[in-house]
Amino acid sequence: MSDTEDTNNDNKVEFEDRSKTSRRDFMVLTASSVAAVGAACTLWPLINSLNPSADVLALSSIEVDLSNIAVGQTVTVKWQGKPVFITNRTPDKIAEARAVKMSELIDPEEDQDRVKAGHDNWLVTIGICTHLGCVPLANQGDYDGWFCPCHGSQYDSSGRVRRGPAPLNLAVPPYTFISDKKIRIG
């Protein structure tokens, strides 16, 4: 009988150890879960504050109706606090811009790369001189494009810098044609 008693006692001890381990594991799991949920609840507002606010999102893209812009006319709209020039170029201006040799340009870029395919007459550029940030004047200068009154940079009808201290062409913002007469900038 002594063998049986020892066996029963061993089993009893094993059973007690398992229940203590089980309770301990449950408590650790519960405490860890509460800590993880607490950390997530604390970090959520912090991470969410990094998202842009509603007023910034409102300015992130604009739609522009092109139907009122006559051939040969340049219109200025405001996007993200910057002036954007939208030009409805004449066929002569397009041909003139495409005839320019790349070796003549300070910042070589093909005219076709500055416009959307199928909409070659529409040129959309950010209206800030790449030298010191002045706003160039449309249809001015020796190249009948833009002229920066601050330091004399001159851009052609494709917005490419041709003369002066500006190191780069007028930037082209991200834009898409929603229809033949409407674009979305941004």
UniProtKB/Swiss-Prot annotation:
Instruction: State the SUPFAM superfamilies in the record.
Output: ISP domain (SSF50022)
**Alphabetized UniProt keyword annotations:** 2Fe-2S, Cell membrane, Disulfide bond, Electron transport, Iron, Iron-sulfur, Membrane, Metal-binding, Translocase, Transmembrane, Transmembrane helix, Transport
Tell me the membrane topology, using the record's own terms. Answer: Single-pass membrane protein
Q: Which cofactor does it need?
A: [2Fe-2S] cluster
Location in the cell? Cell membrane
Pfam (any one): Rieske
Task: Give me the disulphide-bonded residues.
Answer: C134-C150
Q: Which residues are noted in the entry as [2Fe-2S] cluster-binding?
A: C129, H131, C148, H151
Rieske domain boundaries: 97-184
Top EC class of this enzyme: translocase
Q: NCBIfam families, alphabetically?
A: Rieske_proteo (TIGR01416), TAT_signal_seq (TIGR01409)
Something else the entry says is: The Rieske protein is a high potential 2Fe-2S protein.
Subunit structure of this entry? The main subunits of complex b-c1 are: cytochrome b, cytochrome c1 and the Rieske protein.
Stated name of the protein = Ubiquinol-cytochrome c reductase iron-sulfur subunit
Q: Which organism is it from?
A: Rickettsia bellii (strain RML369-C)
